[in-house]
Amino acid sequence: MKLRTNAGPLQGTIQVPGDKSISHRAVILGAVAKGETRVKGLLKGEDVLSTIQAFRNLGVRIEEKDDQLVIEGQGFQGLTAPCQTLNMGNSGTSMRLIAGLLAGQPFSVKMIGDESLSKRPMDRIVYPLKQMGVEISGETDRQFPPLQLQGNRNLQPITYTLPISSAQVKSAILLAALQAKGTTQVVEKEITRNHTEEMIQQFGGRLIVDGKRITLVGPQQLTAQEITVPGDISSAAFWLVAGLIIPGSELLLKNVGVNPTRTGILEVVEKMGAQIVYEDMNKKEQVTSIRVVYSRLKGTIISGGLIPRLIDELPIIALLATQAQGTTCIKDAQELRVKETDRIQVVTDTLNSMGANIKATADGMIIKGPTVLYGANTSTYGDHRIGMMTAIAALLVKQGQVHLDKEEAIMTSYPTFFKDLERLCHD
């Protein structure tokens, strides 16, 4: 598709879709909680729809009523063996978390994904789940999907130190631990997003978080809840950056989730000189509205414990850095290489093709700015965040056209992205 270029100031108010991480977990926990769970504000992107369909195939009744998702949970014993393969589409979250959940079930299941998901490493969950007594393996020396899993009603608790910073691996172990008899401990390398821990407690589960160590004594039962999903900060990030780099822009981003394990991008842009104001902050619900205006920015260093708190925002932060004065260094982000694409290489190649000055490194990027961006032929490579980054970059282009291939990938997390973009350009 041909992207909008040479945009004037962006003006208006935006309500971004529901948080993808919280939406997944609301469905997963609701499916094994006892009673009727109702979810408001659920993201209806393709990834979350894959999770919903998986649980329907596992015998859970899920339907939409009055703009809410209603899940009829029957507890951990309420799942039934699927009559078909579980297709997780493009969703690594679906595959890894549901594998952890099914670890304690007395049946066998095969889990598959699309071409992109089939290239993403699964050994990171295979090893701990095998230690708990699950028969699980992937193809190509257990590394990649499809996954074949035979659950075990008699799971063993484990103490597991994560070799990488991964909320998905942590979550898979905790979901299995809810069904294991005894004490399971997960020790993180760096603190990652904690939605699973918070939502297990919200559903009546018990665990202890002590710094980087999470302790859970199982087995436990969960109780149905009413969940309101806040706006996704990872989706809001695209408008945050657009407002900062397009001269004359002023945007109000409504109802954005600001869980502290996800707000690294806000700290980074403020350090770079961004003018942002928080309105209607609700610290208990971890939700705020964010007013952003065009700002002159300077380069920075992004590394260490900050990386897990903004890992999904690094592509759009890279674009931001192309418009900042000076050099921005992103380090310790090697996990980007095993996302939907090798995001280090794809971000570098895409933005450099438009005139940016970015050098890819083994674990990040070195970005020099500011640079003028020009038209180019680009692709999402099947990665939703690459597609949205490119669409925001195109708004700065004053010479040439920007063509984007495989734009349908954006449906994964933000089905109304282009509709919202057009509205902000016209408000």
From Swiss-Prot:
Residue positions binding 3-phosphoshikimate: 20-21, 25, 166, 168, 312, 339
Q: Which domain of life is it from?
A: Bacteria
- Which residues are involved in binding phosphoenolpyruvate? 20, 92, 120, 168, 343, 385
- Which GO cellular component terms are attached? cytoplasm
This protein's UniProt keywords: Amino-acid biosynthesis, Aromatic amino acid biosynthesis, Cytoplasm, Transferase
The positions flagged as active site in the entry are 312
Q: Does the keyword Transport apply?
A: no
Its EC number(s): 2.5.1.19
Q: Which CDD domains match?
A: EPSP_synthase (cd01556)
User: What is an annotated GO biological process for this record, any one?
Assistant: chorismate biosynthetic process
What does the subunit section of this Swiss-Prot or TrEMBL entry state? Monomer.
Query: What family name appears in the similarity comment?
Result: Belongs to the EPSP synthase family.
The function of this protein is:
Catalyzes the transfer of the enolpyruvyl moiety of phosphoenolpyruvate (PEP) to the 5-hydroxyl of shikimate-3-phosphate (S3P) to produce enolpyruvyl shikimate-3-phosphate and inorganic phosphate.
Instruction: Name it.
Output: 3-phosphoshikimate 1-carboxyvinyltransferase
Which species is this UniProt entry from?
Streptococcus pyogenes serotype M49 (strain NZ131)
Q: What is the lineage of its organism?
A: Bacteria, Bacillati, Bacillota, Bacilli, Lactobacillales
